[in-house]
Amino acid sequence: SNLSTVWVIAVVILFQPELRRILIYLGQNPFVRYLFRVKNLAMVGEITESVLICQERKWGMLIVMEGEVGLKHIKEKSASINAQVSAELLVSIFNPTSPLHDGAVIISHEVIDAAKCILPLSEEPQGARMKLGTRHLAALGLSEETDAHIFVVSEETGTLSHVHNGVMKRGIDEIQLRKVLNNLIV
């Protein structure tokens, strides 16, 4: 067992340039890229479906798509999920009777990483922001500190908002949602 581990490490070290070229080739191969694209398109569909269901039912929803800035400090204080993204799971998490429905869901590296995440509130609730609910203020707060894309469904109106870099776009529709998700994921 120890000898085989040494051999694997030796092969990786000796053939590092060749292995790197193979990985680059695979990354540029249209078939391999197509396989990843199909998987990612499915994830876009799952997220979109869950948003539409929660909008229809007027269930509050807060989905964070983690960017380059890590959210480890938030995930540590939340419920770890580590599950494949599915509409059924997202809808069940945001069901008002679910113990996980309060807080945000963080999607990271194509998995639902955590739920019941408490996000920082925006520190400047002035003007129009004074009329926002806690979910929207939390989305703004996180977007002011990180590069995450956050999607919020209002439980009062069923309206979908997209928040990024401290800017909130309210009333986005299914087409706009798919476009943003495609740019993020695919």
What residues fall within each predicted segment?
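Divalent-cation
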Residues: 10, 15-18, 22, 26-186
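Membrane-water interface of transmembrane alpha-helices in multipass transporters/channels
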Residues: 1-6
